[in-house]
Amino acid sequence: MKKLTLSTILALTTLMALGQSDIPRVYEVENTGSQLALPVMPEPDQLPVIHELPDALEGVNSFADWQKRRSDIAHMIQHYGIGEKPAVEPSQVKARMEGDSALVVDVTVNGETLTLRSVINYPKSGQPPYALMIGTSMISLPKQLFENRPIATMTFHESQVNDYSQWRPHHDRGEHNFDRLYPNLVENGAYSEWAWGLSRLIDGLQQLGPEVTKIDTRHIGVTGCSYAGKMALYCGAFDERVALTIAQEPGGGGAAAWRKSHESKENVENIDKTDYHWFLESQREHFKGDSVYQLPYDQHELCAMVCPRALLLLGNPDYPWLADDAMQPSAEAANKVWEHFGIGDRMDLSIIGGHMHCQLPEVQFPIVEKFIDRFLSEK
């Protein structure tokens, strides 16, 4: 069994001048940088070659600078990697509860309506409003991690937005529910659209309020495994209302750096060998092979977008395709952002083998419980 945690390979550097109490754990809005000027996006062939992982902290001298840097990273990832996650006005969202536990959210854009429906499973202990863990496609973490905690759970059914699947019949690109609302974004990858969908569920929870939903929207987590681990990471990175993101075995295109997976001698998921329903086709066109070094960002910066909120990455080295050897340096590079602000303990990595894919071993329970208790239950 291979066991590795970020805390064993990185020394946490605390900035004495900046205490954790000064740094928010979560925000009440989806995107704090929504009013910032958009960065210039050069044509791909005009981008410089960068062999090392790009500096996530470029131009950042203080926490106040991070909002702009984070916004720039978000725009790069959308422009070159996954496609646009469009903003939605509050007036375009109408939420209601059906029965005691079903959240229904109607989103109307350009005269078209998309309906999201998810059942909230309330805990048997504690008092409302409850913290909430949302599973992307499902919650693959063991049920016992939530059964004895005052945390509600809910599934984001991504097929309600974009029904692409590697295992079942699905619509083609441009024919998904999302595309009815945004026909100009038919080239989008699924991850931008799925992140959009989860944000609309949070819109609905906020609109109805804790008196109706029994949910504390300042304590929302998101988790998923494999392709849904990537989904959880994109959802958490692109919505600052998510307090805790747990990406389980997300593989290439998730937390694993594209540059590092390109250099791997193993058969791993890299920028040439991923599923391009998830990403912009233009990403493969412009950044395949050694052209990956012209990508102006890498996946450590997707991870860093979660900062200053909490992020836990879980790996499994028994499945080389997951590219954990590329996730480790990516996580180390991302953690430097949290460390820079004296909050390095809000992010961690745990890579442990000896178990099946998406089956969390008991030896990993403590680190998951630590993050759940600290950032959802605030123990």
Where do the model's predicted regions map?
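Cap/lid segment of the alpha/beta-hydrolase catalytic domain
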Residues: 135-218, 251-254, 258-260
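Mobile cap/lid helix-loop segments that gate and shape the active-site cleft of serine hydrolases
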Residues: 248-302, 323, 327-331, 339-344
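C-terminal catalytic histidine-bearing segment of alpha/beta-hydrolase fold enzymes
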Residues: 332-379
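Short beta-strand element of the alpha/beta-hydrolase
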Residues: 117-120, 128-137
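N-terminal pre-domain segments of enzymes
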Residues: 20-83
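Gly/Ala-rich beta-loop-alpha elbow adjacent to hydrolase catalytic centers
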Residues: 224-228, 232
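Conserved strand-to-loop "acid loop" that flanks and positions the catalytic carboxylate
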Residues: 307-325
